[in-house]
Swiss-Prot record:
Parts forming coiled coils: none
Pfam families: IMP_cyclohyd
Keywords, in A-Z order: Hydrolase, Purine biosynthesis
Protein name according to UniProt: IMP cyclohydrolase
Family (UniProt): Belongs to the archaeal IMP cyclohydrolase family.
EC number: 3.5.4.10
The organism of origin for this protein: Methanosphaera stadtmanae (strain ATCC 43021 / DSM 3091 / JCM 11832 / MCB-3)
Amino acid sequence: MYLGRIISIGSSKDGVYASYRVSSRSFPNRKSVVNNQKVAIIPTQGSEDDIYKNPYISYNCIDIIDDICVVTNGSHTDIIAGKIREGMNMKDAVALSLLTMDYEKDDYNTPRIGGAINTKGEGYIGIVTHEGIEVKKVNPGESFYVSTYEHNTPREVDYTATNAKEATEFIFNGGIFSEFTHPVTSCAAFNKDEWEIDFKNP
């Protein structure tokens, strides 16, 4: 099954995570790049001109603000993170940013998905489509994911990871995510005592 872009946030006794996966049939030539406390999705070498074909394929997907990690499938990462830096709570930052930015105006009306979670495991995950918006609370000990296609309402998931590398691998091809096709790149932030980031570019 093809889900497109996927985000997941959650926590367990092992720690707190926020992860992201790009699955793509149209623009598979992309990679994750870490820049301080952020992860960006950019075209691979030789595919830089793809951004002129689709402006939505390059963006920050993870941003860490003190004890909070934001993860999304687009430029609204910066909007949500900016609101949180200004003092807005996670729920309002996620919901307002999704509502304001709306779904992507491409050929597929691609939904925007986004989430934020703190080091206590408290978070919110949401999606805005051409039909509406949904934002769900994530409690400590819970894990949820949502994708741009098919599974486009937050679903609970058994997510196994004890560090950033394992969280990155899991959303790429672990557990239920192994059933979803066309993985391109993945990344994750994980917090046990402090935030760490990892990424996978096959």
